[in-house]
Each structure stands twice: as C-alpha cells, then as structure tokens.
Amino acid sequence: MPQLDTSTWLMMIMSMFLALFIIFQLKISKHNFHFNPELTLTKTQKQKTPWETKWTKIYLPLLLPQ
C-alpha cells in the first residue's frame, strides 16, 4: 500500500490561510464605518387596538363560598 505524501500539506494550509486573510481584509476595507454614531429618535405612532376603542365589561371574579 503506497504511503500518502503529506510533505506539501503544511504549505497548502498556510497559503490557504494567507489567501483567506487577504480576501477578508479586502472585503472589510470596503465598508464605511461611522466614527461617531448618534442616536436618531424615531417617532412611534401608537396604534389603537380593538379593545381600546370599544367599551368592555369588567367582571369581578366569582366569589367562592368560604
């Protein structure tokens, strides 16, 4: 059974990591990041739910005999 030649694996793995590192650096360098982000307040409009617009009866809980 022939032996598997693993002498080039280290070079392949190292070159793969280097290539991935360069690719990710190029991708990240294209993004624009804001240096001083400020909060923007958005006005939220309150939507009325159906039970807020209608009158509903509120019942007392049933009285249990003591």
Curated annotation (Swiss-Prot):
Keywords of the record: Acetylation, ATP synthesis, CF(0), Hydrogen ion transport, Ion transport, Membrane, Mitochondrion, Transmembrane, Transmembrane helix, Transport
InterPro entries per record: ATP8_mammal, ATP8_metazoa
Entry keyword Membrane: yes
One Gene Ontology biological process: proton motive force-driven ATP synthesis
UniProt GO cellular component terms: mitochondrial membrane; proton-transporting ATP synthase complex
Function (record text): Mitochondrial membrane ATP synthase (F(1)F(0) ATP synthase or Complex V) produces ATP from ADP in the presence of a proton gradient across the membrane which is generated by electron transport complexes of the respiratory chain. F-type ATPases consist of two structural domains, F(1) - containing the extramembraneous catalytic core and F(0) - containing the membrane proton channel, linked together by a central stalk and a peripheral stalk. During catalysis, ATP synthesis in the catalytic domain of F(1) is coupled via a rotary mechanism of the central stalk subunits to proton translocation.
Family: Belongs to the ATPase protein 8 family.
Subunit note: F-type ATPases have 2 components, CF(1) - the catalytic core - and CF(0) - the membrane proton channel. Component of an ATP synthase complex composed of ATP5PB, ATP5MC1, ATP5F1E, ATP5PD, ATP5ME, ATP5PF, ATP5MF, MT-ATP6, MT-ATP8, ATP5F1A, ATP5F1B, ATP5F1D, ATP5F1C, ATP5PO, ATP5MG, ATP5MK and ATP5MJ. Interacts with PRICKLE3.
Name by which UniProt lists this protein: ATP synthase protein 8
